Amino acid sequence: MQLKVFSIRDSKTGVYGTPFYQHTHGQAERSFQQLAKDPQSTVANHPEDFDLFHLGEYDDQTGKLTPLDTPEHCVKAIDLIKQQ
């Protein structure tokens, strides 16, 4: 099965977080939105600093990772907060 690989980038540190896997962009955005609304998370406390990126694909049958040439921006945490 093909899974999409995502990461949350912290613009203050210039670092991409540990990658995570979802079936769709929508699932990844929903997970990111939940994190952005969790008052205990750094993302919720500094939403202007965090963005969700799509990094590539992962095939769980072959173990093959296929990265994108350039990470693809999905959504900013601050925009998800504004949707509340």
UniProtKB/Swiss-Prot annotation:
Key words of the record: Host-virus interaction
Classification via Pfam families: Phage_ORF5
UniProt similarity note: Belongs to the microviridae C protein family.
Function: Plays a central role in the packaging of viral DNA into phage procapsid, which occurs in the late stage of infection. The protein VP5 can interact with the replicative complex after the completion of one round of DNA synthesis. When protein VP5 is bound to the replicative form, the complex becomes accessible to procapsid and serves as a DNA packaging apparatus.
Stated name of the protein: Protein VP5
